[in-house]
Amino acid sequence: MQPNDITFYQRFEADILAGRKTITIRDKSESYFKAGDILRVGRFEDNQYFCTIEVLSVSPITLDELTEQHAKQENMGLAELREVIKTIYPNESEFWVIEIRLVN
């Protein structure tokens, strides 16, 4: 069994599979992805594979630079997006927006 390249919390699985979540915002530890990468995706909770995605772009961003468009791409409101990021990365201020496309 191949290892997964990236994981998402289970609550995001349906949105990824339906194409409603088209970006992910990560900290520096996951800023190495690049456009064209094909990634196996697993659930964070159990590492179970659930799809394959392609990275379309990777760009730096701060919490204050997040817009309604980013929130829409995450399938949530802007205030909710900022709260989710602060909860996942409480001590970080610089992030990377990874634009993704579902492959299968």
Curated annotation (Swiss-Prot):
Transmembrane segments: none
GO molecular function, one term: hydrolase activity, acting on carbon-nitrogen (but not peptide) bonds, in linear amidines
Keyword Ribonucleoprotein: no
Catalytic residues, chain numbering: 21, 24, 74
Coiled-coil region list: none
Similarity annotation: Belongs to the N(4)-acetylcytidine amidohydrolase family.
Protein known as: N(4)-acetylcytidine amidohydrolase
